[in-house]
A protein has these predicted regions:
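Class I S-adenosyl-L-methionine-dependent methyltransferase catalytic core
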Residues: 1-113, 119-160
Length: 160
């Protein structure tokens, strides 16, 4: 991916964002929440750890997500090199991670909200698992690429 000087990731969302998120949603999973605990203001034992299996590299060993679920911390091991798709978003996550999350945390009939759609990996996972998704992305370039990615994914599934 190329991050062409975008500055959308220069600060965390506002307190008003988190207040509204908790108002409109029953449960939450928030990636990068370890940088925003001062705004989340809720205890959680049910964090998710994505072990990126980077080995001895300069990149982060993993990512943390806050969850509102009263469960033990869970980890998911997956190296991005297993993905055969080119990355186009700097925080792109694998579809397999979102499928694992849906399998572990979502119930049939749940409606999924993603306020930071990014590359659209969650959209592919929701499509694969049969969940309704409402997604938002502030960057039109990423939004368009995510929509196209989902369109191609859906068309490939209907060919066979």
């Amino acid at each position: 991916y190329k991050n062409k000087g975008k500055d959308w990731d220069s600060e965390t969302p506002s307190q008003e964002y988190y207040d509204e998120l908790f108002r409109v949603s029953k449960n939450q999973i928030i990636w990068g929440a370890n940088y925003m605990v001062d705004k989340i203001k809720r205890p959680s034992m049910g964090w998710i750890y994505w072990d990126k299996q980077n080995g001895d590299s300069d990149f982060s060993d993993g990512e943390l997500a806050f969850t509102s679920f009263n469960r033990a911390l869970r980890s998911f091991k997956y190296h991005l090199s297993k993905d055969r798709h080119a990355r186009f978003h700097p925080t792109q996550k694998p579809v397999q991670l979102y499928e694992w999350i849906l399998d572990k945390y979502a119930n049939e009939g749940d409606k999924i909200l993603d306020t930071h759609l990014g590359s659209g990996s969650i959209a592919l996972a929701c499509h694969n698992r049969g969940f309704d998704l409402t997604g938002f992305e502030i960057d039109s370039e990423y939004h368009n690429k995510a929509v196209e990615r989902l369109r191609v994914h859906r068309s490939q599934l209907t060919m066979f």
